[in-house]
């Protein structure tokens, strides 16, 4: 799929998602109170859809506890992000940090100036420059294709459904069994694993090498295997590598392909890599 076609497809998915959510609210209103409540619920749904389009990234940033960085705090990160964004002909993403000793990276927003890139303190302390460049390029590629727009809105809707059902009490726990699969179905219907392969391929081109991203993916995967991650699993699509354990409720929201397959595809872009690696 070409870049322009991918943008159009993702914009279509976004408006279908927002329209579907509004229609669902309208259906609830009709069941509860007929046409009068139907009109009110549809109107509220449209307002919520507009709010999601413009502010879903802020909701995500609040959920993960991110704060915006200034350039003096992480000058190399800003330099790398500016360089990669310029190569992709995109504005530099807004850069945020979460206090987490383990390497993690995620993005949220609409793309362009609405794109927020979040890194953990553990990633800044552990990643090599080429790895950091590869991860930034991967997320910029998502923003350029407007994958990020669909991922963010689907993630926020799913996360909100789960948070509502987790509020406590037997009724909310019952809702979890109903809303959990619904939120999962929404994400799987809109988010194909192919989007990750496409972003990986574009990132390799932006970096002139696939190996920085490949090494970074392995680093993130190893960290996930060593330490379990507590968070809202509906936000899984926003992370570069799935940080959640692949069991229980989190298993419903897996939209990333296996990391080992992603790394293998990246290494295959450099046919001589294995020979050079063995010689070294």
Please give the residue ranges for each predicted region.
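Short amphipathic alpha-helical coupling elements at transmembrane boundaries
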Residues: 79-86, 134-137, 141-142, 159, ...
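Short alpha-helix carrying the canonical HExxH Zn2+-binding catalytic motif
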Residues: 118, 128-145, 149-150
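Residue-level signature of catalytic and energy-coupling elements of molecular machines
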Residues: 34, 57, 81, 119, ...
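Catalytic Zn2+-binding segment of zinc metalloproteases
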Residues: 140-159, 168, 211
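Active-site scaffold of zinc-dependent metalloenzymes
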Residues: 105-129
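Hydrophobic or amphipathic, alpha-helical segments that drive membrane association/targeting
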Residues: 1-104, 160-173, 177-189, 197, ...
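Active-site-proximal gating segments in proteases and membrane effectors
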Residues: 89-114, 184, 204-280
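Soluble non-cytosolic domains of exported or imported proteins
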Residues: 190-193, 257
